[in-house]
């Protein structure tokens, strides 16, 4: 295996939408950084089975909905 071609693999803290925190190893960020999730398995409708509204941090969901609002029109 070649040296110095792989990204740094270090420990980060992940904070889920309900405030639950856990430590994991990742190439994201720097050692000790905190990754705050916008959506996870506890809040995503695909896993919760409901039609719950998604949290819109940063306007991503609203931009997506505006862009694709007429894509699947129900007659």
Curated annotation (Swiss-Prot):
One of its GO terms (biological process) is translation. Signal peptide: none annotated. One of its GO terms (molecular function) is rRNA binding. Pfam families: Ribosomal_L31. InterPro entries: Ribosomal_bL28/bL31-like_sf (IPR034704), Ribosomal_bL31 (IPR002150), Ribosomal_bL31_A (IPR027491), Ribosomal_bL31_sf (IPR042105). Keywords: Ribonucleoprotein, Ribosomal protein, RNA-binding, rRNA-binding. SUPFAM superfamilies: L28p-like. The keyword Plastid does not apply. Part of the 50S ribosomal subunit. Binds the 23S rRNA. This is Large ribosomal subunit protein bL31. It comes from Nitrobacter hamburgensis (strain DSM 10229 / NCIMB 13809 / X14).
């Amino acid at each position: 295996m070649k040296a110095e071609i792989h990204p740094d693999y270090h420990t980060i803290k992940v904070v889920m939408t309900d405030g639950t925190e856990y430590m994991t190893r990742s190439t994201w960020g720097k050692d000790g950084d905190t990754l705050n999730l916008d959506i996870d398995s506890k809040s995503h409708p695909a896993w919760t089975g409901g039609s719950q509204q998604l949290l819109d941090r940063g306007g991503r969901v609203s931009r997506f909905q505006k862009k694709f609002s007429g894509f699947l029109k129900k007659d």
